[in-house]
Structure formats: structure tokens, C-alpha cells
Swiss-Prot record:
This is CTP synthase. Allosterically activated by GTP, when glutamine is the substrate; GTP has no effect on the reaction when ammonia is the substrate. The allosteric effector GTP functions by stabilizing the protein conformation that binds the tetrahedral intermediate(s) formed during glutamine hydrolysis. Inhibited by the product CTP, via allosteric rather than competitive inhibition. Homotetramer. CTPSs have evolved a hybrid strategy for distinguishing between UTP and CTP. The overlapping regions of the product feedback inhibitory and substrate sites recognize a common feature in both compounds, the triphosphate moiety. To differentiate isosteric substrate and product pyrimidine rings, an additional pocket far from the expected kinase/ligase catalytic site, specifically recognizes the cytosine and ribose portions of the product inhibitor. It comes from the Bacteria. InterPro entries: Class_I_gatase-like, CTP_synthase, CTP_synthase_N, GATASE, GATase1_CTP_Synthase, P-loop_NTPase. The lineage of its organism: Bacteria, Pseudomonadati, Pseudomonadota, Gammaproteobacteria, Moraxellales.
Amino acid sequence: MTKFIFVTGGVVSSLGKGITAASLAAVLEARGLKVTMTKMDPYINVDPGTMSPFQHGEVFVTEDGAETDLDLGYYERFLRHSKMSKTNNFTSGRIYQTVLNKERRGDYLGGTVQVIPHITDEIKHRIHASGEGHDIAIIEIGGTVGDIESLPFMEAVRQMQVELGRNRAMLMHLTLVPYISSAGETKTKPTQHSVKELRSIGLQPDVLICRSEHAIGEENRRKIALFTNVEERAVITCEDADTIYQIPRTLYEQDLDDIICERFGIDAPEADLSDWDKVVDGLLNAQGKVTVAIVGKYVELPDAYKSINEALLHAGITHKTQVEIDYVDAEALETDDSLLARLEQADSILVPGGFGERGKLGKMRAIKFARENKMPYLGICLGMQLAVIEYATNVLGLEADSTEFNRKAAEPIIGLITEWLDEKGELQVRTDDSDLGGTMRLGSQKAELVEGSKLHQIYGAKLITERHRHRYEMNNRYIEPLEQAGMSISGYSAKQHLVESVEIADHPWFIGVQFHPEFTSSPREGHPLFASFVKAAIDHQNI
């Protein structure tokens, strides 16, 4: 039966609960255990699909088309044998929506609907469902202990600990141990108060992960153990690392996996972390460096492009090359000529996905720069669409645009997808008046690559599967004039012949893809498209 590890955070947010939980999952998986992970988010939004990237960071898309928290990207990158799905991320909004729908249907037989038991029961039901078929399920609770929004989740965890017992449930609490530089001291009091807050709602941590900029020391570990009622060996120190991919070994060297296996009565072989050692070695001992200019409109918050950042990092590991990212504000690039110098200094240019017209002309300016200067270019989703618009405008001389920006465009080369088959093969229909949330072409879709194309060579296969998140697509009636002018279509959707990718034949490396390859990149395997893109940047640097 599935064992559950609940992960909470205290003192401050952004301590790295997701990374720590994923690192633990990687160590347990390395011991031969079947591990899955779930993120519970206390906010009222049904999902993060319509949330601003400035507030929430990127939206990570799963194989089955769920728009989820970016932490699920960490989960997939750290786990080799477990893919996330719709069951692995849910919010307060989703829980309340489900409970209210049941109330409207009469499922509660006229009873008074309350937080306890109805909301907490729905939370517990989803936790159990997410862990089915696995040895261990790690459940991360978003936010910080003490947040009013997270109380129903904490109560559900408390109930599950009672119902499952010590041999099937345990609590891991992440906390900050700050270093006061003026006093030259590490302070344990915030951790003590954080655990006190947990205990006030009936939760006692079994493991403490103490985050700090500096070494905490054995004396402070003993002090924390004494005042929090946690076994001293279960007080795990986690100092700032050079790379997040060092964290699995950090946890392993402090026997966290042994503590968990002993608690759950699991007999499993020792973990082999040699793969992670190779990843860390590739990152920290790079033999060269390239710069990739990412031209977007959310550049003030790198988390908005988290999976792309990581995919470039993974490609760097493949080539033992440090990939430095220069974030260029697309909106500023529209009028600021001085930013062109940053494009000139880069070794390649990437325009990521996005929505809305803001920054459009700056992105197209960067695309034109890459095209005319034979600089490696990768366009993802909107980055592909704008590459098509730029080419049609400046090479074909058309008044081309997307109906996303101009519904009365003279040459609507990009338009709304009105019908497509989803990942289950079911017909989906959309109009301009459809809701924004949950109405896109989402999840894994098959694409057929044109034989002999650069993309076909990169993937080494004719049929590929990649994840999508878009509601606009290239208009097929422009395929012929584009191809006659030198921009070829290198991939189509397997069933409906939607354009999936474009490339320019007389350019060293110019590719646009409608899908999101960054969602399937991992530190141990990388991704062929990003690996080829970084190799093209290395080649361009050496010209």
C-alpha cells in the first residue's frame, strides 16, 4: 500500500519545497522504489492556466493536458520513471468547485456542506487517488504554515496521519535558519516558532529540512532537535548549493532515505546516484560558454520561463558548455536600438511562447535580426508564429498578422484553431467567445516530420510526440507561398495536418515549433532540439 510523505514549509516562502521534495523523490527512486508526487495549491484559482506569469511563474503542461504549477516541472525533471498528470496538482479553487457541483447535484442529500468534513474529505480523496499504484507518494502543500488559505489542507493531512498510522504517513517540514551577519550567528528561533505553529494545528514534523546560507553546525542541530521534538538525525541541513542537482546527494549523505525506509518498514537496495554526479560534473566543469538571448515580455521574472531555462542548462550539460541566458525585454526592444548590441553579443536567439500583443514588434525585430545575420534561432509556440509573420511580412511583402492581435487582418496567416482532436482522440470545438481557461489545444500530440528536414535529422524519427499549449495556429493556405519563398514546413500534426514546425533552408539553424519541447527535457537525458540549438550556438561562436 502507498506510503505518504507530506511536505510543508515555514518561516518564509520560496525556500525550495518543490526542489527538496523532488530531490528526495529522486533518491528514493534510485533505491528502486516507485515514487510519485503531488502539489496542493491553496489559492482559489481553479488552475494556474489564466494566472499572470509575473505572479505565478510558468504554467507547466502535463502529458494529459493539465495546466499546472511549475513545481510539477521539477518533479518530472528529477523523476525518470513517473510522469505527472491532472491528478498530481489541484487547488483550493478546484476542490471548492467539485464540492459545490456535488452539492448542486444533491450528492450530499440536503446536508449542510462544511469545510470539515466535505472539503477535507475531497482533499483526502484526491491525495489517495494521486498515490495509487506507487510505493511512495510525496505530497507538497503550497504556501507557508500559518496561511489561512492552507488550513483545510493541513487539517486533511492531520486526519490522514491519524487514519493511516505511523507506518504509512510522515511529515517533512522545510524551514529557514537565518544567518545574522552583523552578529555572526545562526538563529534557530524562527524554526522553533514554525514548528510550534504546526503543532498548534495538530501536526508534529518527523523530519526537519533546515535551509540556510551558512553551515548550521552540530550544536544548532541539537538545539533544533531538542526544542522541536524531532530526532536529531532527522534534522537535515540543506545549505545553498552551486546547482539544484546537488541536492539529491546532499539528502542522501545525511541518510534521509534511510530514515524514511526505516519508518515505513521498506527494505530497498542502496541508491546509485552516479547519474546525478555526472549531471553536476557537466554543469560545474564546463569547458566553454555560449550566450542565448531570450527575447520575451516576462523577463523580469525568470521563473516565467523556468522549463526553457532548465532545458538550455541540460543542453549545456550534453556539450559540457555553460549556457548563459541574457533576458532581453521585447517591449523595450521595439524602440531601444541599443538593445540590438546585446543581440549581436549573443550566440543565438530564442523567442518563447506567450500571449497578447505586448512586445510583439520587439520579438519580430529579434527574429529578423537572427534571420538576416544567420544567427541560430529557436521560436517556441508564439515564437514560431511570429517567425512566420515576420517572414511573410518582410520577405513575401504581405500585410500578415495573427487574428489574436487583429481580427480584421488583411492576411490572417495565424488564426484561431476552431477544431482539433485532443489527447484522447475526442473532437474539441472553440470560438472567439470561448472561455480563456482550459480551452486550448493542450497536452501531448503526435507530429509527423518531413523526411530530410533539419528537424527530422535532429529527432532521428519521423513521428514524434510533444506537448502543446496554444489556441492559434498557422493558416494552411499560406503554406505554398511561404515554401516558394524559402520557408519550409517541416512538421504537421499527425491527424489534422496542422503546421507543427517551420525552418529556413538557406539558414544555418532557424527553426520554429508550435509545441513546447522544454516540458520534456531532463538533466540526465536532455532534449535533442535544445541540444542541437546549443550546438548551433557553439558553431556560430566559432565562425
